[in-house]
Design a protein with these regions (language model features):
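Gram-negative and organellar
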Residues: 25-318
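Bacterial N-terminal signal peptides
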Residues: 9-21
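Positively charged n-region of N-terminal signal peptides that target proteins for export
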Residues: 1-6
Length: 318
């Protein structure tokens, strides 16, 4: 479908993403409106950058875990004098328990890339049938972040399911399987696993070991993005999650190895830091920093990727 951002998408998206939560929100006398502002920056070894902006309104706002809304966004991709804007409209919905994060967290919408209207989103439904067991269903999609893929309007989707199981007081295992189709006809079968061992539970310190792999259905994607027939990666490291006042601070630092097809194993590394908490009044901010030295969508030797994101929610007085 060729369009910049079809007019019918606005109405259809608003109806799809907002009709149900609108009815539910109308019953609460404590609901209010909030302003949402997000900014993100990305860079990598290919000097492929992305500056993303999102702004919108949240309705039926009870907390950062309970609201719905609409937002406009734009991602400005650039590399070596080339640039492209990918703009879109996004519907937002969140209804999760504060103690377990059970419930639904969803954002879904349409963006315009290379004259094509593409669906994007990130939807996760989580449930704990028992205190020691968790289940998640995931649906997601986005544009493929390389210059060649953006010029051709290539995007991807993701359908996945994961199971989390606690073994005793200190050990947790997570297994995820998924399918990742691309609009160019390629697809990937995904498998990921994680083992978490609590070292100092009272301090929030854990040891994590992770495995991820995928197999591609079509090796030839005309160099639009990094696409080996088979990719495998493992890493291990320390993670920390603590509450400091009203803030939640978490971090991860680790290293591992990756293998592309039958080539030799290469060293990888990852570092991540996230902080979320209150600002003045009822406002809330979340900051996330990430640095990774593992393969992504770009086919570059000694690849690295870095990102920084800031998310601010400001409830308005009624």
């Amino acid at each position: 479908m060729r369009a910049t951002l079809p007019a019918f998408a606005w109405g259809a998206l608003a109806a799809l993403c907002c009709a149900v939560p609108l009815v539910a929100a109308a019953d609460s006398a404590t609901d209010r409106v909030a302003v949402l502002a997000q900014m993100g920056a990305e860079d990598d070894a290919d000097e492929f950058g992305n500056l993303s902006l999102r702004g919108g309104a949240l309705f039926g706002y009870q907390s950062h875990l309970q609201h719905w809304g609409l937002a406009l966004q734009n991602a400005h991709y650039s590399q070596d004098g080339w640039s492209e804007n990918v703009a879109g409209v996004i519907g937002l919905y969140r209804n999760q328990r504060a103690d377990t994060l059970e419930g639904l967290r969803a954002e879904a919408g349409i963006v315009s890339v290379a004259g094509n209207a593409r669906p994007v989103g990130d939807i996760t439904w989580s449930h704990r049938p028992r205190e020691s067991t968790g289940v998640e269903l995931i649906a997601a999609g986005d544009v493929v972040g390389t210059r060649a893929a953006i010029e051709r309007g290539i995007s991807y989707g993701l359908l996945a399911a994961s199971v989390e199981q606690q073994f005793g007081a200190r050990v947790t295992g997570i297994l995820l399987g998924g399918w990742q189709p691309f609009t160019d006809g390629n697809s990937r079968a995904l498998l990921r696993a994680r083992l978490i061992v609590g070292l100092l539970p009272e301090q929030g310190l854990s040891l994590q070991a992770r495995w991820r792999q995928y197999r591609s259905s079509d090796r030839d994607v005309d160099d639009a993005y990094f696409n080996p027939g088979e990719y495998r990666n493992w890493d291990a490291g320390l993670s920390l999650r603590r509450r400091v006042g009203g803030w939640t601070v978490s971090g991860l630092a680790g290293a591992g190895r990756e293998r592309v097809d039958q080539e030799s194993w290469q060293t990888t590394g990852i570092a991540e830091l996230r902080a979320e908490g209150p600002l003045a009044g009822k406002a809330r901010i979340a900051v996330n920093l990430l640095y990774s030295r593992a393969a992504g969508f770009a086919a570059t030797d000694d690849y690295w990727y870095g990102s920084a994101n800031v998310n601010v929610i400001i409830p308005l007085a009624r």
